[in-house]
Amino acid sequence: MRLLVTGGAGFIGANFVHSTVHEYPEDSVTVLDSLTYAGRRESLDGVKDAIRLVVGDITDAELVSQLVAESDAVVHFAAESHVDNALDDPEPFLHTNVIGTFTILEAVRRHGVRLHHISTDEVYGDLELNDPKRFTEWTPYNPSSPYSATKAGGDMLVRAWVRSYGVRATISNCSNNYGPYQHVEKFIPRQITNVLTGRRPKLYGSGANVRDWIHVDDHNSAVRRILEKGRIGQTYLISAEGERDNLTVLRTLLQMMGREPDDFDHVTDRVGHDLRYAIDPSLLYSELYWAPKHTDFEEGLRDTIDWYRANESWWRPVKDAAEARYQQLGR
């Protein structure tokens, strides 16, 4: 299969490229990435001789059309994704997550190419902490941040292009990912690298907010399954059913790194911070017979800590800038 992977130098996209190269060596992989601060050429060093990297913007219609015409399928990871950045400056999120997705859709429509669109559970808003409900494919959209609103907009465009133009597309909405190559602005790698650089870890508010954690490799194996077996026009929710509150995750991480479990600072909470995300992945499990392999969160977290310990040359160049940005925001 000739795959075009947008955002393939970012966290989830780079891991998808690595797994594709190793598990599907017959595939040819082209990565389209603008290499903004969160997309890094170094994330593809281990597979650079097995892929083609094209540096460009997904809103460049001519470039996108050319690359899509050479492909059998597009896996669309490219997105601006950090909520704090969206609250401070939403324009890049509209540019990439909405206009970029429109550009991809027009290209796959023109050339008749299969598309899988990667999205987030944040489009559904949040749940109360003690609410037994979980998100399903039929939960109404209720985004609560500029980031999730732009991702919801992209999802709606995909659905409209499927119905109006017969585009062969699927959508997946996934819960919070963790694993290698995640930018140090994100919750888990920020805390790991704070410890490794002698900084105190930081926790928004009380830390009661709940996230549904999944290892990035499990997310990507589900994406591959949907790409190959998913029903056109269908949305699938991806989850390893790993709900944990942020305080518990931080304390677990600190203990694994030899620190006292309360050796961190509480900082000002994010405006409108979503309380709880929880996904019901029953459709994916029952229809496509997918299941996660990394079901032991503590083991996955320990492996992630080990990866950051062993790959300081990857994260160290961006760490100081990320923390300076957090200082500006008072977090």
Predicted regions and their residues:
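Short aromatic-enriched loop/helix-cap "lid" or pocket-rim segments at secondary-structure transitions
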Residues: 41-44, 127-131, 182-185, 216, ...
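Residues in well-ordered alpha-helical elements
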Residues: 62-65, 84, 91, 102, ...
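N-terminal Rossmann-like NAD(P)+-binding domain of SDR-like oxidoreductases, especially those catalyzing
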Residues: 1-177, 307-311, 317, 321-329
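The catalytic Tyr-centered alpha-helix of NAD(P)H-dependent dehydrogenases
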Residues: 132, 143-150, 180, 184-188, ...
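C-terminal substrate-binding subdomain of Rossmann-fold SDR/epimerase-dehydratase oxidoreductases
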Residues: 56, 73, 195-331
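Hydrophobic alpha-helix immediately C-terminal to the catalytic Tyr-X-X-X-Lys motif of short-chain
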Residues: 153, 157, 161, 191, ...
